[in-house]
C-alpha cells in the first residue's frame, strides 16, 4: 500500500529483545523475528509465552502497562521504533489489532471503521474508497453499518476491529489472537481475508 520495494525486503526486524514490567518482572528474553514484505509471520506459543507482549513491544504499547524494552532493538523499514508513540507508528504503516473485540461500543460500525482513518491526509474520496474495500472484504459490516458496535456479534466486532485497522492503510498488520472465541466458519473467513491482504 505504500511505496514499491523489492519483495524480499525485511519490513520488521525484532532483534534479541528483553521486556520487563514494573522494573522487575522479566517477561521476554532474547526474542528475535523478521517479517518480510508481503509475508505472513505467526508467533506460536502457549498461554503466557509472551506473544501479546512481543506485539505490544513492536506497537509501542508497553508503556501503558508499565512495561519497557530494556535490551535489543525493534526496527521497521530499517529505522528504530524506540521512542515513537503508537500513532506515529500507524502513520509509518504499522497497526495492531488487539486481542479480544476492541470496538467503540457506543459508535456505529461505520463510525468505528472511520476512526481508523484518523491519521490519513489523502482526502475524503480515498477514505470513502477504502471504506468500500472494507465492506467488500466484510459484507456483513455493510449490512450492520448503522448498528451500534456493542450490539453486534463477536464475529462482527472482530471484523470491525480488523476493518478499522485496514482504514489506516497499513503496510503491516499485527493481529493478536484474531480467531479467539469465533465460530470455525468465521475463523476460516477471517484467515482467508488476511491471506488475501
Regions flagged by a language model, labelled:
Residues 22-23, 41, 62-65, 109-129, ...:
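ABC-type ATPase nucleotide-binding domains, specifically the catalytic core motifs of the NBD
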Residues 44-46:
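The feature captures the beta-strand-to-loop junction immediately N-terminal to the Walker
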Residues 69-79, 92, 126-131:
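Conserved ABC transporter NBD signature motif
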Residues 167-171:
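A short, proline-enriched helix->beta-strand linker immediately N-terminal to the Walker B motif
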Residues 55, 106-116, 145, 175:
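Short coil-to-helix segment of the ABC ATPase nucleotide-binding domain corresponding to the Q-loop/switch region
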Residues 107, 151-152, 165-166:
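ABC ATPase signature
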Residues 6-14, 18-30, 37, 62-67, ...:
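A short, flexible loop at the N-terminus of ABC-type nucleotide-binding domains that lies
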Residues 148-152, 156:
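Conserved ABC ATPase signature
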Amino acid at each position: 500500500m505504500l511505496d514499491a520495494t523489492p519483495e524480499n525486503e525485511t519490513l520488521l526486524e525484532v532483534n534479541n529483545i528483553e521486556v520487563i514490567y514494573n522494573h522487575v518482572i522479566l517477561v521476554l528474553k532474547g526474542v528475535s523475528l523478521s517479517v518480510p514484505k508481503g509475508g505472513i509471520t505467526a508467533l506460536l506459543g502457549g498461554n503466557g509465552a509472551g506473544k501479546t507482549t512481543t506485539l505490544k513491544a513492536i506497537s509501542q504499547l508497553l508503556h501503558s502497562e508499565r512495561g519497557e524494552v530494556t535490551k535489543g532493538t525493534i526496527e521497521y523499514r530499517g529505522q528504530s521504533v524506540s521512542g515513537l508513540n503508537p500513532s506515529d507508528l500507524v502513520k509509518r504503516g504499522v497497526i495492531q489489532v488487539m486481542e479480544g473485540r476492541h470496538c467503540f461500543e457506543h459508535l456505529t460500525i461505520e463510525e468505528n471503521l472511520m476512526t481508523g482513518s484518523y491519521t490519513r491526509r489523502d482526502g475524503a474520496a480515498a477514505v470513502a474508497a477504502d471504506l468500500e474495500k472494507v465492506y467488500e472484504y466484510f459484507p456483513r459490516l455493510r449490512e450492520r453499518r448503522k448498528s451500534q458496535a456493542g450490539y453486534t456479534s463477536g464475529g462482527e466486532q472482530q471484523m470491525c476491529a480488523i476493518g478499522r485497522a485496514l482504514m489506516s492503510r497499513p503496510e503491516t498488520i499485527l493481529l493478536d489472537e484474531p480467531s479467539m472465541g469465533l465460530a470455525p466458519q468465521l475463523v476460516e473467513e477471517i484467515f482467508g481475508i488476511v491471506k488475501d491482504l
